[in-house]
């Protein structure tokens, strides 16, 4: 199509997607299904590893899987019927009926990856520069690609966002999330039973831990085949952030330390703290975790998701605190709404203007909601 003044709905848009993880695949699949000519470029050379474990499977995520992939959501999700808060001794403080649905990063990634054509998913291709006016991308190897539309779905560390908005950067929220997953088979029967069919929490001073079952590494959702996903939000409480985020190789990381890379003294100190600061069942879960990891909690707000014929999608534009349980859902919604906007408007300019306005507003509201939730739960609001 001519780049701007023809209807994207009438002819194919050529689309370059930078980023082949969750946001990029939501985009690639949604636009491919809408009839556009999409190519996805992922900087990693091989298949992506799981980057976080559990996901709350919001309705928009389940709907996307049902409509656009071969996966039936019920086959890749777990459910709970009760939300439970524990006391420090492990007794039940409150229990309320609350139906929740969960899945795992790897289950959703596999479904999306299988739904997108192999010949248009390119690994080892890192975008290093973009020209928004022409939707052109330059890669690390010096090659270039022009398209009608460029979508940067590169996550919270997006280099494209840094180029388009150099004054925008993530703001540290003054606390971290320790995380891990444990095969159900590694838990005692009593501990596994304590978390079965329950979304379980414990709130301490400047601390909040939660846990729920997710599909196993091969997608198993039957008892015994699952994994228990846990997240422990924790204020730094005087600890040195630089020391905490220095990995086993001695490199200081800005956003966190991945599984298997924690320094032994840091990991040992947090495990020791778990044994005294958490209820017995949660302490047992942390003790059974092979490779816990830690991530910094950040807030990120971008003034606009659209610059000319380039747009930012998902965490590349907005990072809300995980308490919202909406990061994956927002990426799916961004992608679906982008496909709808291209179909509903006569020109690319009009489509991007409408989409950018609506999704920027949604992202801003989500970030603010995450701030309120996190500050309230961690006692940081003053």
Regions found by a protein language model. Give the residues of each.
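Conserved FAD-binding catalytic core of PHBH/FMO-like flavoproteins
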Residues: 71, 91-93, 99, 103, ...
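Extreme N-terminal leader/targeting segments of oxidoreductases
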Residues: 1-14
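A short coil-to-beta-strand element that immediately follows conserved catalytic motifs
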Residues: 267, 278-293
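Short, flexible hinge/linker loops that cap or flank conserved catalytic cores
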Residues: 7-10, 144, 224, 303-306
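Conserved mid-domain beta->alpha element of the FAD-binding
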Residues: 17-33, 37-39, 44, 151-152, ...
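C-terminal domain-closing interface element
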Residues: 376-382
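Short, flexible helix/strand-to-coil boundary loops that buttress conserved ligand/catalytic motifs
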Residues: 51-52, 68-69, 164, 324, ...
């Amino acid at each position: 199509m001519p780049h701007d003044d023809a209807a994207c709905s009438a002819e194919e848009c050529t689309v370059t997607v930078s980023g082949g993880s969750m946001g990029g695949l939501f985009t690639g699949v949604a636009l491919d299904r809408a009839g556009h000519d999409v190519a996805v470029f992922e900087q990693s050379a091989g298949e992506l590893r799981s980057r976080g474990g559990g996901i709350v499977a919001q309705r928009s995520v389940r709907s996307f899987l049902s409509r656009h992939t071969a996966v039936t959501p019920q086959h890749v999700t777990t459910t709970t019927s009760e939300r439970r808060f524990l006391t420090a001794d492990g007794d039940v403080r409150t229990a309320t009926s609350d139906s929740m649905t969960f899945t795992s990063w790897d289950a959703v990634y596999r479904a999306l990856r299988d739904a997108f054509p192999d010949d248009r998913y390119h690994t080892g291709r890192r975008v290093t520069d973009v020209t928004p006016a022409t939707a052109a991308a330059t890669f690390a190897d010096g090659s270039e690609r022009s398209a009608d539309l460029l979508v940067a779905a590169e996550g919270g560390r997006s280099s494209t966002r840094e180029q388009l908005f150099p004054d925008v950067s993530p703001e540290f929220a003054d606390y971290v999330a320790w995380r891990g997953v444990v095969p159900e088979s590694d838990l005692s029967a009593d501990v596994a039973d304590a978390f079965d069919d329950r979304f379980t929490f414990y709130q301490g001073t400047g601390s909040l831990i939660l846990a729920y079952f997710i599909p196993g590494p091969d997608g198993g959702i039957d008892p015994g085949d699952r994994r228990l996903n846990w997240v422990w939000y924790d204020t730094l409480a005087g600890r040195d952030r630089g020391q905490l985020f220095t990995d086993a190789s001695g490199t200081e990381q800005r956003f966190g330390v991945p599984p298997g890379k924690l320094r032994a003294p840091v990991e040992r100190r947090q495990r020791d703290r778990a044994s005294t600061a958490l209820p017995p069942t949660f302490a047992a879960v942390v003790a059974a975790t092979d490779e816990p990891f830690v991530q910094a909690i950040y807030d990120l707000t971008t003034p606009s998701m659209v610059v000319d014929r380039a747009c930012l999608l998902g965490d590349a534009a907005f990072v809300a605190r995980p308490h919202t349980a909406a990061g994956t859902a927002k990426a799916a919604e961004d992608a679906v709404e982008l496909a709808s906007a291209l179909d509903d408007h006569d020109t690319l300019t009009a489509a991007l203007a409408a989409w950018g306005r609506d999704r920027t507003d949604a992202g801003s509201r989500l970030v603010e909601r995450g701030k309120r939730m996190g500050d309230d739960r961690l006692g940081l609001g003053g």
